[in-house]
C-alpha cells in the first residue's frame, strides 16, 4: 500500500463500488508489519525449508536481504502472462503458481497472513511424496461471494470426477478415523452422486506441481477466461479447485490438519489470536485481517508484541 506505482495502478483499474461488492478492500493489501515474523518463523520452526519463492508485484521490503541464497524474489511478470497484468486478484496469481521458475515439484503455499509459530516437520506437509490433507465435505450456504466462487470450482470437479468411483477407489482416505466428527457429511452424503464443497483449514497448503498442470489441461479455457479479472469477481475460480482436484485424484495422505492449525478472524477473535501466539497453541495460524476491526492500532500492537515474544531474534533474511 505504500508503493506509489502500485497505488497508482490500483486506483487506475479499481472501481470502489464493484470491489466492495466482491469483497475487495484495503484490508487485503495493507501492510501491518508482521512479514518479518513469517521469515523468522520459517527459519526457527522449519529450518528444513530449502527455498522460499517470495511473490510480489515487483516490490521488496526495505529490511529484506534479497541476497539470501534461500530466497528467490518473484515478480508477477515472471510467471503470469503479460496480458493479465497488472492484477490485484489473488486467485488469478495463485492459479499460475506452477509457472514460477525453479519451483519444486512438491511445494507448500503460504498466504501472507499464514504464520508458523511452533516447530513443524516436513512430514506435516508431505508423506510418501504426497501432500497431507483432510478430505471432508462442508455445507456451502452460498451466502458470500467466496462461497459462490467455490461452487464454480465444484462444477468443474463434477464434470471430471465421479464421486462414487472416487469413494470406491480411495475409501480409506475419505473415511480416515482421525477426521472425527468433521467427516459426518462424508457418511451422510455417501448415496449422493455429486461432490459438494470441501472443508478447508485456510492455512499453509501443500501441493504437487503436477496437479496444477493437470487442472490447466482440463479446465484451461475457464481459467484463462477469468484471468482477465483484475479484482475479485463472482465468476472466479479459487485455489480450492486445485486442492479439491488433488484430493479427488487421491494424490494426498490423510491427516486431520485442523489439529494443529487455526484461523483467527481479527474482527471477532483478536484476543484469542494474541493468546494463541503467546502460548504457541498451534503450529500454524492464520491472522485474518478486516477493514472494520475495532481498536485496530491497539490490536496490531498487541499482535506484534505476541510475535516478538516467540520470535525476538532477527532471521538471516533481515538486513
Residues of each region from the PLM?
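ER/Golgi luminal nucleotide-sugar-dependent glycosyltransferases, focusing on the catalytic module
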Residues: 1-108, 115-319
Amino acid at each position: 500500500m505504500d508503493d506509489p506505482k502500485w497505488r497508482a495502478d490500483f486506483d487506475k483499474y479499481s472501481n470502489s463500488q464493484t470491489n466492495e461488492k466482491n469483497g475487495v478492500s484495503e484490508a487485503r493489501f495493507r501492510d501491518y508489519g508482521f512479514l518479518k515474523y513469517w521469515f523468522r518463523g520459517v527459519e526457527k520452526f522449519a529450518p528444513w525449508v530449502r527455498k522460499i519463492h517470495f511473490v510480489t508485484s515487483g516490490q521488496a521490503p526495505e529490511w529484506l536481504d534479497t541476497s539470501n541464497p534461500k530466497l528467490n524474489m518473484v515478480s508477477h511478470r515472471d510467471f503470469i502472462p503479460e496480458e493479465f497484468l497488472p492484477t490485484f486478484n489473488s486467485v488469478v496469481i495463485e492459479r499460475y503458481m506452477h509457472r514460477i521458475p525453479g519451483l519444486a515439484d512438491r511445494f507448500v503455499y503460504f498466504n501472507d497472513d499464514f504464520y508458523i509459530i511452533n516447530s513443524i516437520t516436513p512430514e506435516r506437509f508431505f508423506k510418501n511424496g504426497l501432500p497431507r490433507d483432510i478430505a471432508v465435505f462442508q455445507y456451502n450456504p452460498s451466502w458470500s461471494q467466496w462461497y459462490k466462487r467455490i461452487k464454480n470450482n465444484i462444477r468443474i470437479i463434477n464434470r471430471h470426477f465421479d464421486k462414487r468411483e472416487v469413494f470406491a477407489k480411495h475409501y480409506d482416505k475419505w473415511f480416515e478415523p482421525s477426521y472425527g466428527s468433521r467427516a459426518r457429511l462424508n457418511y451422510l452424503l455417501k448415496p449422493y452422486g455429486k461432490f459438494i464443497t470441501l472443508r478447508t483449514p485456510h492455512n499453509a497448503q501443500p501441493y504437487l506441481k503436477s496437479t496444477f498442470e493437470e487442472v490447466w489441461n482440463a479446465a484451461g479455457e475457464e481459467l484463462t477466461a477469468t484471468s482477465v479479472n483484475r479484482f475479485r469477481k463472482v465468476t472466479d475460480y479459487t485455489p480450492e479447485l486445485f486442492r479439491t482436484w488433488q484430493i479427488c485424484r487421491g494424490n494426498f495422505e490423510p491427516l486431520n490438519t485442523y489439529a494443529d492449525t487455526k484461523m483467527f478472524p481479527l474482527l471477532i477473535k483478536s484476543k484469542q489470536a494474541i493468546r494463541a501466539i503467546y502460548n504457541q497453541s498451534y503450529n500454524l495460524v492464520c491472522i485474518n485481517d478486516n477493514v472494520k476491526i475495532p481498536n485496530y492500532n491497539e490490536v496490531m500492537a498487541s499482535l506484534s508484541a505476541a510475535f516478538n515474544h516467540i520470535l525476538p531474534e532477527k532471521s538471516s533474511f533481515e538486513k
